[in-house]
Amino acid sequence: MNRVYVKKEFCISCHLCEVYCRLQHSASNELLKAYKKEYPHPLPAVRVEERGNLALSVRCQHCDEPLCLYACLGGAISCDNDSGMVNYDPEKCIGCWSCILACPFGAIKQDKEQKRIFKCDLCIGEETPACVANCPNEALVYIDIQDNDINNPDSHHKQTNNIKGGV
């Protein structure tokens, strides 16, 4: 099960992860068209949170026990037990936003134009997510969580809680 993690000491808050996420999920795959001409506008499923000198790229963590899944009233969120991916079916979304409220990382976003949510899909079908492949400082890494200690104090989960003001 691969996940995206942030090496906080290398993130310079350039927001290119947001740009490449938007581009990857655009119909045209062209930067200018994705930002100016496509409708509905492609939205990035990642965002950069900044607090003082700390910056982190925040996205869906594809949790082992996804609170968004349990909160989803329309059955739009599911978990693939083989890959560990938390998936989303926009056709089933009823726009109740319960998943947004349930996510402890604030990683699920509201698409007000389409009246549904959007979240990181790890650029399904690609070898490496666009945010990771295009990070100029290699602050984002795509690693197998089975081979790494995610309970380490520098893990992305704890980093995200700290930047959001948690414990």
PLM regions: where:
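N-terminal beta-strand motif that seeds the catalytic metal site of vicinal oxygen chelate
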Residues: 1-9
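A generic structural signal for beta-strand entry/edge sites
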Residues: 3, 83-85, 117
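Conserved beta-strand segments that form the floor/walls of ligand-binding pockets within enzyme
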Residues: 5-6, 87, 102
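Aromatic-flanked redox-active Cys/Sec active sites in thiol-based oxidoreductases
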Residues: 8, 74, 90
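N-terminal signal-anchor transmembrane alpha helix
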Residues: 12, 18-25
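A short local structural element in Rossmann-fold oxidoreductases
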Residues: 22, 73, 104
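Flanking helices and flexible, charged tails adjoining ferredoxin-like Fe-S electron-transfer domains
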Residues: 27-70, 90-167
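Ordered, amphipathic secondary-structure segments that act as subunit-interaction surfaces
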Residues: 62-85
